[in-house]
Each structure stands twice: as C-alpha cells, then as structure tokens.
Amino acid sequence: REVKSTVTPYTASPLDGYPSAPNRVTVTATSYPITVGAGGAPKSPPSPNFTGNSGSNSVFSTVTSAGGGGGGMYGGGLAGVPAPAPFVTASTALNGGSGGGGGSLCSGSAPLNELLSNKGTGNTPPVSPSQGNNGGNGKNAYYYSAGGGGGASSGGADASGAGTTAPTSIGGAGGNGVATSITG
C-alpha cells in the first residue's frame, strides 16, 4: 500500500502503508520492473479438479502482491442426488492475496442449508499491511449457493437463503475493493 503524506495532491487507499523502512519503497526517476497481475484462467472439462485457477501476482520493484485465490467448484447432482465422481463434493477455494469463494454442494451427504467450511484464506502469504481478505463459505443447497471472493477492504460473504428454490438460494457477494487516485 502507498503511504499518503498530508501535503500530497492525491487520494490514497484507506489501507495506508508503512511510512518507514523496511516496508517502504522510495522511488526515484528511473526504471522499475512492474508486472500487472491477471485474473485466473478458466478451467473446463474434463479436468479432474474444477477449482478455479488463482490470479497471477502483481509486482512493483521489490514488492510482490499475491493474486487472488481461485473459487471452489460446485459438487453434487441435480435435486439433491449426488452425481458420479468427481462431482460428489464441493471443493475448497484456494488461498491468495484475497481468498476465493467456497463452492456449493447439492448432496445428501451434508444437511441441507448447512454452511460449508470451504472458503479460501486471504493475505496468503501473510504480510502487513494485509493484501486482502478471506472468501465466503459455500452452502449445501439446491441452487448453487457459492461464497463470494474476498476483497481488499472486506471479506467475501457466505452463501445465504433457504436453498430449496432459486430466488431464496443466494450466493455470497464479493468483498469490497479500495480506490486510489494519483494525478499530477
């Protein structure tokens, strides 16, 4: 995170960085290696693991920010009937700068409408200030109630709703980000 001086003419992230070394990078008018991370690439059948791919890292000089964790996959079959392997259990989301949202489950192997413990952990690897937050947990429900992915300023929400009809089975919202505006 950037450090905002009281005299600088821009708006900084509300997650302020450290004003002193060693966590500070002082910049001068020269070239710096910069990599802008990308979102995770999709997976498609017949992959045996449908957990989403994680995003790639972003780099500025010596500072690396981890990409977000891939989301968990849906597990189970239609109308609560488990499908053949490998679609029997919902996968756990992956850890990352922000954690991925946990997959949903539609199976008789867990009580209906039970939250699953399958969210991805944010701020992985752990650093200070934090890179991001945890994803939300998925749910055992008929209508694909996955958890939301974590954001920079808040975690992803758990899936909610009764889970027996489409309008009442709700996936979790993704966590909020933060804004920075540097001009001049």
Per-region residue spans from a language model:
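Glycine-biased low-complexity/repetitive sequence motifs
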Residues: 1-184
